[in-house]
Curated annotation (Swiss-Prot):
A single BP term in Gene Ontology: methylation
Catalytic activity: 5-methyltetrahydropteroyltri-L-glutamate + L-homocysteine = tetrahydropteroyltri-L-glutamate + L-methionine
Pathway: Amino-acid biosynthesis; L-methionine biosynthesis via de novo pathway; L-methionine from L-homocysteine (MetE route): step 1/1
UniProt protein name: 5-methyltetrahydropteroyltriglutamate--homocysteine methyltransferase
Cofactor: Zn(2+)
Residues that coordinate or bind L-methionine: I434, G435, S436, E487, D602
Gene coding for it: metE
An example molecular function term from Gene Ontology annotations: 5-methyltetrahydropteroyltriglutamate-homocysteine S-methyltransferase activity
Lineage, broadest ranks: Bacteria, Pseudomonadati, Pseudomonadota, Gammaproteobacteria, Enterobacterales
Top-tier EC class: transferase
PANTHER family (alphabetical): 5-METHYLTETRAHYDROPTEROYLTRIGLUTAMATE--HOMOCYSTEINE METHYLTRANSFERASE
Residues involved in Zn(2+) binding: H644, C646, E668, C729
UniProt: 5-methyltetrahydropteroyltri-L-glutamate binding residues: R17, E18, L19, K20, K117, R518, C519, W564, E608
């Protein structure tokens, strides 16, 4: 039986981020809808051709999205929130953009749909909204149009469709509460119609994505799979597709389904292939996701060959990417500045397609020449194991020497708080900001000129110093109590630290989509991490010299740096996090020596690092908390440690939030009207809290009365003596005029509350 290969999806944005540029040009009114549609058409044609040329047997169609593939599915099903609908009920690309962004070149602006993380990745999807009794109909034929495009170009294709149960699982009920699973029978006819249309076009296989099957689903959701797939069977062959984790716990549900094939993620999952092979119906096709779609490392194809060869001829087999290649940059050949040795360890999306082709050929015809080709390809990643760039004996020794004392502050919080009160003598309702101030065109230009060699180090430092001086003066004028230096020198909160730590490398063009038109370029962790010299001390010390008020030192925490980078695969995430923590522990010590008495360690990614299955949460939370404490615990008792977190759900991890033992935690609460504080109240959270009093994602300036009302609400839940006053998040994306006004109102609200207490 001949093995075929396929990818589950391909990056959409284009090698030069053409899609991003076309979207933003269209949104700004600088190009027409037809010009935007043409860019999409060109990108799809190019990506199909590139995959085919790299040796992919079946190219995916339906993985392209103008904003997000879950949003595309919503439109396919005619699921458009009332506030985003066209007057005549039609659906067009502007409908899609109104749901994603809240506005488009046509139609009335309305609040955008909610956005959240796609499983445990750094990609975000638009959350479908459901209401009781809503109607569904085939409303957006993008998938069928793209299938026609690909067939006209002569490609062998496999359409991709987000499965009905995962789609419902990912959505939220709006308005009156009801069980959204009850909508299953209403959406299935649309799926049937789409599959019938694909069958008419001669399509043999459809990839139907049900990643919810890797989760611990409630029984009623698992029970829904059988009738759902009973309704969908018969028109085309269905490849039930899972990714991001194992499926063993749901295997009984899966193997009873009327589908013709199953895709499993063999990279992130830990399913025993022999057991899986034995447990599945004999006639099923088994697709094995062996090439990691979420990282940038070259595969050891020789190892995969040895692992997979026993399965050859046991059943129909396909080889695929573990998940969509959406999460990987496009082409390693674009990287001209990477060191040759390091570059030889990497594979981006196009290289991963070539890996699939090479491995498939070897398994189909395992002759000496093919095996030698596999060995030659795998040699660099094998040589990496002993590279001096990867291993640092000092880091490994230091890690091994960590004791339980290294992760605990000297005194408990109550005693520390007393010494800190004496040192800082802050008023009631102390005011501060989260860290960054507006990143003006001037600041960005300064950094770019320095990076590209147009500005020498001395002039760059002079320029940054001026911006820090301005930030301190602004805060003094506003009357804030604890100041920040404004982070003018930082491009990105993770990239900045990665650039100053050994063990990281950076790409020129390693862009991946985060959401909509937003792309990120994650650093790559290639080896043991250490800090060759102080990173933030010079700027913090300078800022502190300009004022009598305390200035916070600002660090990005170890878990966030790990989660927002491409990690190495040869050691555990725990090991990487603790190496970063040790490097930043030295930074805490140096900041203290420089006279900085308040140090903030941001951990916005702590919650998003959670494994998909609750059974694995405790182990993760244990080492994530330990990494934070290892970073912070070197601080003296009178040094106040702050942390900042921005997400909407604390209930299920309150124990761990408290275990961080930060003296002050600042959180994002304004959009939830302080409801988030319920978690802290119910838990009787013992330390100090700064609930965000205004939403920095909006240019709207909150009134003094509005902020005051929010603070009063907060004081009903948390004793006023433990409350701080601050915005939700950093102010880097805002302009100075609204920043000044909002902070002035915030300070005034705090002053009014203080006066009441006198």
């Amino acid at each position: 039986m001949t093995i075929l290969n396929h990818t589950l999806g391909f990056p959409r944005v284009g090698l030069k981020r053409e899609l991003k540029k076309a979207q933003e040009s269209y949104w700004a009114g600088n190009s027409t809808q037809e010009e935007l549609l043409n860019v999409g058409r060109e990108l799809r044609a190019r990506h199909w051709q590139q995959q085919q040329q790299a040796g992919v047997d079946l190219v995916p169609v339906g993985d392209f999205a103008w904003y997000d593939h879950v949003l595309t599915t919503s439109l396919l099903l005619g699921n458009v929130p009332e506030r985003h609908q066209n007057a005549d009920g039609s659906i067009d690309i502007d409908t899609l953009f109104r749901i994603g962004r809240g506005r488009a070149p046509t139609g009335k602006p309305a609040a955008a749909a909610e956005m959240t993380k796609w499983f445990n990745t750094n990609y975000h999807y638009m959350v479908p909204e459901f209401q009781q009794g809503q109607q569904f109909k085939l409303g957006w034929t993008q998938l069928l149009d793209e299938v026609d495009e690909a067939l006209a170009l002569g490609h062998k294709i496999k359409p991709v469709l987000l499965g009905p149960i995962t789609y419902l699982w990912l959505g939220k009920v709006k308005g009156e509460q009801f069980d959204r699973l009850s909508l299953l029978n209403d959406i299935l006819p649309v799926y049937q119609q789409v599959l019938a249309e694909l069958a008419k076009r001669g399509i043999e296989w459809v990839q139907i994505d049900e990643p919810a099957l890797v989760l611990e689903l409630p029984q009623e959701w698992l029970d829904a799979y059988q009738p759902a797939y009973q309704a969908l069977q018969g028109q085309v062959k269905l490849l039930l597709t899972t990714y991001f984790d194992s499926i063993g716990h749901n295997i009984d549900t899966i193997r009873a389904l009327p589908v013709q094939g199953l895709h499993v993620d063999v990279v992130a999952g830990h399913d025993d292939l022999a057991v899986l092979n034995k447990n599945l119906p004999k006639e099923w096709l088994l697709s094995l996701g062996v090439i990691n779609g979420r990282n940038v490392w070259r595969a050891d194809l020789s190892s995969w060959f040895e692992r997979l060869q026993p399965l050859v001829n046991s059943r129909p087999l396909w080889l695929g990417s573990s998940c969509s290649l959406l999460h990987s940059p496009i082409d390693l050949n674009e990287e001209t500045r990477l060191d040759a040795e390091v570059k030889s360890w990497f594979a981006f999306a196009l290289q991963k397609c070539a890996e699939l082709a090479l491995l498939t050929q070897a398994l189909n015809a395992p002759n000496d020449a093919k095996l030698a080709e596999l060995a030659a390809y795998s040699a660099p990643i094998r040589a990496r194991r002993s590279s001096s760039r990867v291993h640092n004996a000092q880091v490994e020794q230091r890690l091994a020497a960590i004791t339980s004392q290294d992760i605990e502050r000297q005194l408990p919080y109550e005693a520390r708080a007393e010494t800190q009160r004496k040192r800082f003598n802050l008023p009631a309702w102390p005011t501060t900001t989260i860290g960054s101030f507006p990143q003006t065109t001037e600041i960005r230009g300064l950094r770019l000129d320095f990076k590209q060699g147009r500005l020498d180090g001395k002039n760059y430092r002079t320029g940054i110093s001026e911006h820090i001086k301005q930030a301190i003066a602004e805060q003094e004028r506003l009357g804030l109590d604890v100041l920040v230096h404004g982070e003018a020198e930082r491009n990105d909160m993770v990239e900045y630290f990665g650039e100053h730590l050994d063990g990281f490398v950076f790409t020129q063009n390693g862009w991946v989509q985060s959401y909509g038109s937003r792309c990120v370029k994650p650093p790559v962790i290639i080896g043991d991490i250490s800090r060759p010299e102080a990173i933030t001390v010079e700027w913090a010390k300078y800022a502190q010299s300009l004022t009598e008020k305390p200035v916070k030192g600002m660090l990005t925490g170890p878990v966030t740096i790990l989660c927002w980078s491409f990690p190495r695969e040869d050691v555990s995430r725990e090991t990487i996090a603790k190496q970063i923590a040790l490097a930043l522990r030295d930074e805490v010590e140096d900041l203290e020596k420089a006279g900085i008495g308040i140090i903030q360690i941001d951990e916005p990614a702590l919650r998003e690092g959670l494994p998909l299955r609750r059974a694995d949460w405790q182990a993760y939370l244990q080492w994530a908390v330990d990494a934070f404490k290892l970073n912070a615990a070197v601080a003296q008792n009178d040094t106040q440690i702050h942390t900042h977190m921005c997400y909407c759900e604390f209930n299920d991890i309150m124990d761990s939030i408290a275990a961080l033992d930060a003296d002050v935690i600042t959180i994002e609460t304004s959009r939830s009207d302080m409801e988030l504080l319920e978690s802290f109240e119910d838990f009787a959270y013992p330390n100090e809290i700064g609930p965000g009093v205004y939403d920095i994602h909006s240019p709207n300036v909150p009134s003094v009365e509005w902020i005051e009302a929010l603070l009063r609400k907060a004081a009903q839940r948390i004793p006023a003596e433990r409350l701080w006053v601050n915005p939700d998040c950093g102010l880097k994306t805002r302009g100075w005029p609204e920043t000044r006004q909002a902070l002035a109102n915030m300070v005034l609200a705090a002053q009014r509350l203080r006066e009441e207490q006198i």
